[in-house]
């Protein structure tokens, strides 16, 4: 399954499922958005993750976390670029 936000109705309530594999978009109720590749329901591969406060991460993900090469840009203009492991900048 892949696509843009899969909406599922269960017990008369709607819930949003992450695409299982391939390209897709996942939007959280608090305004965070991920657009990119999924593997087995997790962010995995290249993607863009944005927060309502203006932060944007563009880069690689593995098992739902920032892993690999990527750049985090903050709304004040600060840029953190390099290699990420478990969502932390390491080099």
Regions found by a protein language model. Name each.
Residues 1-91:
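Glycine/tyrosine- and acidic-biased, solvent-exposed loop/turn segments at the edges of beta-strands
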């Amino acid at each position: 399954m892949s696509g843009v936000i899969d909406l599922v109705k269960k017990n008369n309530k709607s819930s949003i499922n992450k695409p299982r594999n391939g390209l897709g978009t996942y939007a959280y109720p608090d305004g965070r958005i991920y657009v990119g590749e999924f593997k087995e329901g997790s962010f995995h591969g290249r993607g863009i993750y944005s927060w309502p406060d203006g932060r944007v991460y563009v880069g690689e993900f593995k098992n739902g976390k920032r892993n690999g090469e990527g750049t985090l840009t903050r709304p004040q203009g600060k840029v953190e670029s390099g290699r990420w492991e478990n969502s932390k900048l390491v080099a």
